[in-house]
């Protein structure tokens, strides 16, 4: 499924003054999928590391910020031979490894040739708990649920999406019935990727509601844990 944020990631990749990037966003908005898809599409290799229940990798960053040592550990953990020019390093669930978040400063200052993206669903909460943040040493990108144009693309309605981009209102008005139909479905699904994908495949409103309920329970659980 197409996410417009992919274009912003590509712009980041091409920047001459690129810094490590932190992908911000709530749970279930598709951060992990986007990072992996970006790596698969635009890099020869992706070294993916998740810090969720991964004490070994958390300990790697707790030791010190020697980038050469860190890269050697990432090589072994990911099973990927990391080379700066063609490897995307993905550090997922980074809120579970405060020192890994802090290490982005050293990637920026001492090893800017590496392409590093980090993400964490509860990162905003973690920062409020006093975790050190690499101010000025990272690029930021916010990811949200599907917007209406992305939803149209997911429903294989690229023609309708392209018409919106032209802002040709006579053309758009000519297909107002189609836009209203899909807008109602967009409002119903809400734009979360798992919901959109299920609706794309099955058009089952009961399934949509069940997935939405599961996501709400996850959010409630997160809130109760804080």
Q: Would you name each region that the model predicts?
A:
Residues 31:
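Conserved lysine of the Walker
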Residues 153-221:
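Interdomain hinge/linker elements that couple catalytic modules in large macromolecular machines
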Residues 125-138:
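Short regulatory helix/loop adjacent to the ATP-binding pocket of P-loop NTPases
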Residues 2-15:
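Pre-Walker A adenine-sensing motif
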Residues 23:
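Hydrophobic anchor at the beta1->P-loop junction of P-loop NTPases
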Residues 55-80:
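Short glycine-rich substrate-engagement loop in P-loop NTPases that contacts/grips substrate
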Residues 34:
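Hydrophobic positions on the alpha1 helix immediately C-terminal to the Walker A/P-loop
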């Amino acid at each position: 499924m197409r996410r417009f944020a992919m274009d912003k990631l590509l712009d980041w990749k091409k920047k001459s003054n690129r810094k490590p990037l932190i992908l911000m966003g709530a749970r279930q908005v598709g951060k992990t999928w986007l990072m992996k898809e970006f790596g698969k599409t635009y890099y020869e290799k992706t070294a993916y590391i998740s810090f969720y229940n991964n004490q070994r990798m958390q300990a790697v960053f707790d030791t010190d910020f020697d980038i050469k040592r860190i890269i050697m550990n990432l090589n072994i953990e990911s099973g990927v031979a990391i080379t700066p020019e063609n490897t995307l390093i993905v550090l997922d669930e980074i809120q579970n490894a405060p020192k890994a978040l802090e290490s982005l400063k050293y990637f920026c200052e001492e090893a800017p040739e590496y392409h590093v993206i980090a993400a964490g669903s509860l990162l905003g909460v973690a920062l409020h708990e006093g975790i050190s943040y690499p101010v000025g040493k990272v690029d930021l990108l916010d990811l949200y649920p599907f917007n209406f144009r992305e939803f149209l693309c997911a429903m294989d309605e690229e023609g309708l999406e392209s018409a919106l981009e032209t802002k040709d209102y006579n053309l758009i008005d000519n297909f107002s019935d189609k836009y209203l139909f899909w807008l109602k479905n967009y409002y119903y699904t809400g734009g979360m990727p798992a919901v959109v994908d299920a609706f794309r495949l099955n058009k089952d409103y009961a399934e949509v509601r069940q997935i939405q309920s599961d996501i709400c329970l996850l959010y409630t659980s997160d809130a109760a844990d804080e």
